[in-house]
Amino acid sequence: MLKKPDYARQPDFFVAYLTDLPLRDQRDVMERPFFSLAKSKRTEPIEYTSPKGDIWVKVFPNTSFGMATIWDADILIWAVSQVVEMMNRGDTDIPRTIRFHPYDLLKAIGRSPKGKEHYDRLRSALDRLTHTAVKTNIRAGGLKKTASFHWLDSWREIVDERTQQSRGMEVTLPDWLYKGILAKGGVLSIHEDYFHLTGGLERWLYKVARKHGGMQEHGFFISLPTLYEKSGSEEPYRNFKIRLRKIAERDELPEYHLVWLADTESGEPSLHMVRRSLLHYTDPAFKWELRRDRRAPKGLRSA
């Protein structure tokens, strides 16, 4: 089992020892099909084109490791949050390589830091992120530009040769993701309960709601066929629709209330996503969110 190191004894090893940060995600990756939504190994690629044909995403899994999953992407959320924290501190030389101890990372993303199996799963996730290939024209700015990258340029673990104990790990973010973090408005806050969502589809739906619903007074409406295409799901549309309706009926996403709308002009159902704090206070789904990265409006702050 890996032990948490005594950082005072390792001054040569920079550790981003920040496990209680407000969470951030890079906004360009939140609504498109960049990750597998299933925990089972996916070896089929994702090929997505927006309805207007102006945006496309292609994701290619490694045959040995499979495609990076939306649970693997928790590591990227943590890394994005670390970079944003450096920016907020006023750091001027922000590296693409982040060094840390796996114990701290596992705690930060809501995983157990106890037991060898959790560290093995972390290493497998890092392998999938390093070997999943992505091509997209997102952020092309109207030009015929294509970005090709992996979710991590590399990762490595530093092990004490004498004790065989881990002194830490490091990951290097790809330039595409790194520039997206540094760009103005390039990140969005993520609710801390996101890591408690167990289903891949629920996790992705939260990201869609956060990206599109935001703080819009009337929320955001999206048709089921459009959601299905954006998800990159391998399951048949009929099964996807059944699962999505059950998720809407449970209505357990952090921050956002889901309403299933069965009768639409197209004949297909749609989903209404609206922020709970914007509902009328008498609505059963209303919930005021007090988050550590946001302050309540003046007059509503607790004494």
Question: Positions of the model-derived regions?
Answer:
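Charged, alpha-helix-forming regions
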Residues: 1-303
